[in-house]
Amino acid sequence: MEVKIKQVDEVKISRYIIKETMEDWYQFVESDVVIVGAGPSGLSAAYYLAKAGLKTLVFERRLSFGGGIGGGAMLFHKLIIEKPADEILREVNVRLKEVEEGVYVVDSAEFMAKLATAAIDAGAKIIHGVTVDDVIFRENPLRVAGVAVEWTATQMASLHVDPIFISAKAVVDATGHDAEVISVAARKIPELGIVIAGEKSAYSERAEELTVINTGKVAEGLYAAGMAVTEVKGLPRMGPIFGAMVLSGKAVAEEITKDLLKSEIRT
């Protein structure tokens, strides 16, 4: 097979990549919302926030997205979704197989790929290989005002390198079971009054409902979504059923959108 391929030398390759990357960072250094973690709740939140017209930046420490979706259930490649979360998956064109009324099985690879694509298509920016290791805070009034970020590879190499800062009107902790961002804020800014109760063992039926109900603001400018909610609020885990995860992402997006709208009205 003969193919005429455009010739691009190494200098152009490097220049174009550096230029476009720096333009993205320059644009998003001041964001409306920073989401930490590109798992199911983080991607769902990113999708709805970007759809609402908010400048939405997602940091993911790994080189892929999906969080716990990719591992499926003990590496089985299927997951469970229940009503009404199926409406979100249908919205992003994930195929569902109904196994009983209101209960669906989905393919893990399709689920995470289409949810991420939907968030990107809506306008969210996802940057891989970046770890959030601290927050920015302000006083009068006391609030979280952004994050400090570092390359994951730098942290893995145990190099002493200062981070850079990203400003945000709202920060969402979607880091999962450890609620990493909220944990740092609770430890380093005790004035925020955050108490982390710790996640409980499995009780799927209750966990799904309680996670969505308790999703939202934990301090001014700082929000919890997904499994971070269970860690902060002392709720049970639910295992490989993901309805609450995407519903939590949607719920936190709706709350942030309302909060930022109120803030704009006041100013």
Curated annotation (Swiss-Prot):
Pfam families: Thi4. Keywords: Iron, Metal-binding, NAD, Thiamine biosynthesis, Transferase. Belongs to the THI4 family. This is Thiamine thiazole synthase. Its cofactor is Fe(2+). GO terms for molecular function: iron ion binding; pentosyltransferase activity. Pathway: Cofactor biosynthesis; thiamine diphosphate biosynthesis. Glycine binds at residue 237. Homooctamer; tetramer of dimers. GO terms for biological process: thiamine biosynthetic process; thiamine diphosphate biosynthetic process; thiazole biosynthetic process. Fe cation binds at residues 162, 177. It is an enzyme of class 2 (transferase). InterPro entries: FAD/NAD-bd_sf, Thi4_fam, Thi4_prok. NAD(+) binds at residues 41, 60-61, 68, 132, 160-162, 227. It comes from Saccharolobus islandicus (strain Y.N.15.51 / Yellowstone #2) (Sulfolobus islandicus). The keyword Iron applies. Its EC number is 2.4.2.59. It catalyses: hydrogen sulfide + glycine + NAD(+) = ADP-5-ethyl-4-methylthiazole-2-carboxylate + nicotinamide + 3 H2O + H(+). Involved in the biosynthesis of the thiazole moiety of thiamine. Catalyzes the conversion of NAD and glycine to adenosine diphosphate 5-(2-hydroxyethyl)-4-methylthiazole-2-carboxylate (ADT), an adenylated thiazole intermediate, using free sulfide as a source of sulfur. Coiled coil: none annotated.
